[in-house]
Amino acid sequence: MILANVFCLFFFLDETLRSLASPSSLQGPELHGWRPPVDCVRANELCAAESNCSSRYRTLRQCLAGRDRNTMLANKECQAALEVLQESPLYDCRCKRGMKKELQCLQIYWSIHLGLTEGEEFYEASPYEPVTSRLSDIFRLASIFSGTGADPVVSAKSNHCLDAAKACNLNDNCKKLRSSYISICNREISPTERCNRRKCHKALRQFFDRVPSEYTYRMLFCSCQDQACAERRRQTILPSCSYEDKEKPNCLDLRGVCRTDHLCRSRLADFHANCRASYQTVTSCPADNYQACLGSYAGMIGFDMTPNYVDSSPTGIVVSPWCSCRGSGNMEEECEKFLRDFTENPCLRNAIQAFGNGTDVNVSPKGPLFQATQAPRAEKTPSLPDDLSDSTSLGTSVITTCTSVQEQGLKANNSKELSMCFTELTTNIIPGSNKVIKPNSGPSRARPSAALTVLSVLMLKLAL
């Protein structure tokens, strides 16, 4: 009898371990957050080919057309449509910045997501795919194309913003698109209208979307030690046409105008997602990714929310959209919070300084890493010093050092004020979801050891 019980337990143990370790346990419609995102244009095509999805999508768009969320929630047909779409690729779809059908993709995304939140959100989720590249990738390309590696003493005295413009002129595509936006933004329309801002913005968008970042970043985020260099950096986007105006509008009003346009709304949401200051990272950036923040910042240039350097000071980095919080009334606190995300943003400041310094940081968190963009914002977060030297800007020595260290699984930060070496990031975030996966916590192997322990105890008791 005891032997029979033991045999049954062994059989049960084998089946239990097989089911727990089986990859099929990770699959199923209930885990739609794990599904890799499809671009919204393709997702729309897939939905249109399926009658159930297509009809439900039309129903949901009709439900959201009235913009009355409470009415939609009370309507069973609207809720049924939403439940069906939540299990389709359309619900999790994302877009790529600069893609061929970007506007169409974003229109599809917002047609679903605009009405699903109650009221106006301060921070909106980004419709763009997450950035996986790092600044170190840009450094390597920039050093190859620009031929950097000069004597540090000579480099310290050079105007890096001027060098960046010269490097752009050596590339046909960069030179062509830069000449185009300079010509358009400098073209006076009349004595009372200095330029056609709409055309200027379009030309700037084409430049920053179509020219590789190893050129655009060097022009936009070049490090400076004197006022002449800093002024050239400020003039990069031709601010007299693209940025400044006779009067500064209220920042919340400007945000409202931006959010009426799908492209502008998406770029602003992407900036908040990638540059919003975080308590939970060393660099104050979400996932310690400087590249994602700088890319999101550059992505806003050429829209109503275009940001720029507020002055030509070489010792401090302060950027802002052309707006103020005058006339905010009882919304002044919200307005100031919105403006501080630009003017007092440690993530953005650190990212700009890191690029000018030729450094990047990867860190291993001491504790669990949560989604950085959901953390409460730090009002005052210590940032890197402002007076970083130009001598290390995009230098070959910096890249060589980082490369040699990377071979050992480390990355170095070689700024004069801060010398750190961090191990590679060991916590992974699954693309297309907000979930964080710890290295040793895979779902398929989470419970077999516990089951084995329990069953061993039961076997021992029965044997006794």
From Swiss-Prot:
The gene is GFRA2. One of its GO terms (cellular component) is receptor complex. One of its GO terms (molecular function) is glial cell-derived neurotrophic factor receptor activity. This is GDNF family receptor alpha-2. Interacts with NRTN ligand and RET: forms a 2:2:2 ternary complex composed of NRTN ligand, GFRA2 and RET receptor. Also forms a 4:4:4 tetrameric complex composed of 4 copies of NRTN ligand, GFRA2 and RET receptor, which prevents endocytosis of RET. Interacts with SORL1. One of its GO terms (biological process) is glial cell-derived neurotrophic factor receptor signaling pathway. Residues 445-464 form a propeptide. A lipid is attached at residue 444 (GPI-anchor amidated serine). The keyword Lipoprotein applies. Receptor for neurturin (NRTN), a growth factor that supports the survival of sympathetic neurons. NRTN-binding leads to autophosphorylation and activation of the RET receptor. Also able to mediate GDNF signaling through the RET tyrosine kinase receptor. The lineage of its organism: Eukaryota, Metazoa, Chordata, Craniata, Vertebrata. It is a lipid-anchor; GPI-anchor. Keywords: Cell membrane, Disulfide bond, Glycoprotein, GPI-anchor, Lipoprotein, Membrane, Receptor, Signal. InterPro entries: GDNF/GAS1 (IPR016017), GDNF_alpha (IPR037193), GDNF_rcpt (IPR003438), GDNF_rcpt_a2 (IPR003504), Glial_neurotroph_fac_rcpt_a1/2 (IPR017372). Gene3D superfamilies: GDNF binding domain. Disulfide bonds join 40-93, 47-53, 63-78, 95-105, 161-222, 168-174, 185-200, 195-241, 224-229, 251-323, 258-264, 275-293, 285-347, 325-335.
